[in-house]
């Protein structure tokens, strides 16, 4: 890696970065920063977690003048990403008279108008709210010299392509430098680049990253009715530090979250119907290690930048390769290894093949853990918990009960009975998940294949409710508006010999 000072930044910025613990530039920063400082348009293709914010944020702060008026506009797909970008920019601008304001939906617009009237140099926002301010003329483009689009493909996926064009058209090309970053380059983004950017220099770090992947990718073949039990078995054996679980629909996310909580896991869910206040609360808990598992739809997870995610579980297989790339990109960051496991119905294997072909690498087949492996993992977990409990002060009344029990029973038998109850307690909890049809062999459509009847899990796990099909109480014919594959808006069998579960290490 290259030292930041060699990239042409000022001594002040170099000192700021050093105080933040940034000593060497990432590949995307190494390539982008000199180009941005020269004023060239930059087209960067890199995944989230590769240092993109620094790639455009560091040169941006260097170019912003110490005078009132918006000089730079940054577009981001979600509120969370907008806030994260703004916080990074404020850190880069430490000690300088540079103000950064965020504008996004779900928050009172009056406060944002008041903040904009104070003359910030940088505005970070989501496309919809930025357009609101442009139409109200509370955001003026006269002095904007730098326009940045972060995660442009995500904004496209969320239906913002026309909004991006509208905003770019409001800032004449001869007036602005444009920097666009995207993990993928679909045709719509390529068209946007051709129409609105001036001879952009392409910076692409994806190939290098993919040749040395930090993410171990697996798939496990499992029928819908066995999926929840298999999933919790993996959780028990993996003991993930932080995990993100992806479900296809809002209903799936809600039911999975409730089921996990009932089993004793610390989980919360995110989807498009969650309020902004609740969303921020959930993300704060997740970042502060108050949660182990975040369950989310694709759209709800877009723009999230959470460090320390050790595992990604695709409870429902994504419908396209781009969604798969974005999902698993939540782990394996900052040089750390990550694990991604996709649960696939036998009739959905064509989707695995499509993902492998698009990414030019194979996923490894992984069998579900055996019951003995699960129990052994639970025993080790309980042993660790007991050791922690022993360091706490016990209530006198509990000590009295313990003394009485030890007088009546053999101490080893007594402890063994209590441990058995702890180890097997999860098996007694019965949960319900609505049956979801597997995807068809067609591209991007929900299929008609798969099992035709629901049933009960017998291994102590979930039950798929297939009763009262016409009454709206579950069943796979119960289609609701928020049950469509989550935009939140608008069979080949492969041998399972490849990798045994015992081969997988945390």
From Swiss-Prot:
- E.C. number(s) listed in UniProt: 3.6.4.13
Where does the record place the region Disordered?
Answer: 434-506
Protein name (record): DEAD-box ATP-dependent RNA helicase CshA
* Function (record text): DEAD-box RNA helicase possibly involved in RNA degradation. Unwinds dsRNA in both 5'- and 3'-directions, has RNA-dependent ATPase activity.
Domain named Helicase C-terminal: residues: 214-375
Entry-linked PROSITE patterns = DEAD_ATP_HELICASE, HELICASE_ATP_BIND_1, HELICASE_CTER, Q_MOTIF
Keywords, ordered alphabetically = ATP-binding, Cytoplasm, Helicase, Hydrolase, Nucleotide-binding, RNA-binding, Stress response
Subcellular locations according to the entry? Cytoplasm
Q: Which residues are involved in binding ATP? A: 46-53
Native species: Staphylococcus saprophyticus subsp. saprophyticus (strain ATCC 15305 / DSM 20229 / NCIMB 8711 / NCTC 7292 / S-41)
């Amino acid at each position: 890696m290259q030292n930041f000072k060699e990239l042409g930044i000022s001594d002040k910025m170099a000192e700021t970065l050093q105080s933040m613990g940034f000593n060497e530039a990432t590949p995307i920063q190494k390539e982008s920063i000199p180009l941005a400082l020269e004023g060239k348009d930059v087209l960067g293709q890199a995944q989230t977690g590769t240092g993109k914010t620094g790639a455009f944020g560091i040169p941006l702060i260097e170019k912003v003048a110490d005078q009132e008026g918006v000089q730079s506009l940054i577009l981001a797909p979600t509120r969370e990403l907008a806030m994260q970008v703004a916080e990074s920019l404020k850190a880069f601008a430490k000690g300088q008279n540079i103000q950064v304001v965020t504008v996004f939906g779900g928050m009172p617009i009056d406060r944002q108008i008041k903040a904009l009237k104070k003359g910030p140099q940088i505005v970070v926002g989501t496309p919809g709210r930025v357009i609101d301010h442009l139409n109200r003329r509370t955001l003026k483009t006269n002095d904007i010299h730098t326009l940045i689009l972060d995660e442009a493909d995500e904004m496209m996926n969320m239906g913002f392509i026309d909004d991006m064009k509208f905003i770019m058209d409001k800032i004449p090309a001869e007036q602005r430098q444009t920097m666009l970053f995207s993990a993928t380059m679909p045709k719509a983004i390529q068209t946007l680049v051709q129409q609105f950017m001036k001879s952009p220099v392409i910076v692409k770090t994806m190939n290098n990253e993919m040749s040395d992947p930090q993410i171990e990718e697996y798939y496990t073949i499992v029928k819908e009715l066995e999926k929840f039990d298999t999933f919790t078995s993996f959780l028990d054996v993996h003991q993930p530090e932080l995990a993100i679980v992806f479900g296809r629909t809002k209903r799936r996310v809600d039911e999975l979250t409730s089921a996990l909580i009932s089993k004793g896991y610390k989980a919360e869910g995110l989807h498009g119907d969650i309020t902004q206040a609740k969303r921020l609360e959930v993300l704060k808990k997740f970042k502060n290690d108050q949660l182990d598992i975040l369950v989310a739809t694709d759209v709800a997870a877009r723009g999230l930048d959470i460090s320390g995610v050790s595992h990604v579980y695709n409870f429902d297989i994504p419908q396209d390769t781009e969604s798969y790339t974005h999902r698993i990109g939540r782990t394996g960051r900052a040089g750390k290894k990550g694990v991604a496991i996709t649960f696939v119905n036998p009739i959905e294997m064509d989707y695995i093949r499509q993902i492998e072909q698009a990414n030019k690498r194979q996923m490894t087949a992984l069998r579900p853990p055996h019951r003995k492996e699960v129990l052994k993992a639970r025993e080790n977990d309980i042993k660790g918990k007991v050791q922690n409990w022993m360091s706490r002060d016990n209530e006198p009344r509990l000590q009295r009960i313990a003394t009485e029990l030890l007088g009546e029973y053999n101490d080893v038998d007594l402890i063994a009975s209590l441990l058995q109850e702890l180890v097997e307690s999860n098996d007694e909890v019965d949960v319900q998940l609505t049956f979801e049809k597997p995807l068809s062999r067609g591209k991007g459509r929900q299929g008609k294949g798969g099992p035709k009847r629901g049933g009960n899990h017998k291994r102590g796990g979930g039950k798929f409710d297939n009763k009262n099909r016409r009454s709206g109480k579950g069943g796979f014919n119960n289609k609701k508006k928020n049950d469509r594959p989550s935009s939140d808006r608008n069979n080949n069998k492969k041998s399972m010999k490849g990798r045994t579960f015992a081969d997988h290490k945390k």
